[in-house]
Amino acid sequence: ALHAVKSGLKAAIVQAADMGGSCVNRGCIPSKALLAASGRVRELRDKHHLQSFGIQVGDVQFERSAIADHAGSLVSKIQGDLTNSLTRLGVDTIRGWGTLAGGQKVTVATADGEKTYTAKDIMLSPGSIPFVPPGIETDGKTVFTSDEAIRLDWLPQWIAIIGSGYIGLEFSDVYTALGCEVSMIE
């Protein structure tokens, strides 16, 4: 949308969920915030390394909820900044779920009903959802996806992470830094 506006085109975004998609809300941004905070915990707990610099620290404590709140605050700020930028540039945001309705048409389902829009060009940017292998059911507590993990609602003593892509590896780093034992399954 930003590129289209800068190229002189009129643009609109059909957005069913939070502005910013997967990266801003459940991926890149909150995971990097969790990595930064948990990385500080790991560094401060490495007493031997710190002593080599002449630094001595006592027990390192952290508030799990404050770390999660920090990530959430960063997400909210970026969502707001993105929304404000789009509004300032004249990009319309249509809240709802869009489906293609033929050539150059999108039908958007909202709480108020459906409306069809016509556009010269339509770009599909559906985002992503975590992959859950067939036969596995998530309950959000004992079996959960990265979408739940990003909230850092609890710290299990042991956690198995299925998938060693960048999200799995980042969560492995976060959870081990905060004291959890992690097993990676690929």
Model segments located where?
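Hydrophobic residues within alpha-helices
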Residues: 1-4, 171
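Glycine-rich flavin
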Residues: 3-9, 14-155
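Rossmann-like NAD(P)H-binding beta-loop-alpha module
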Residues: 153-186
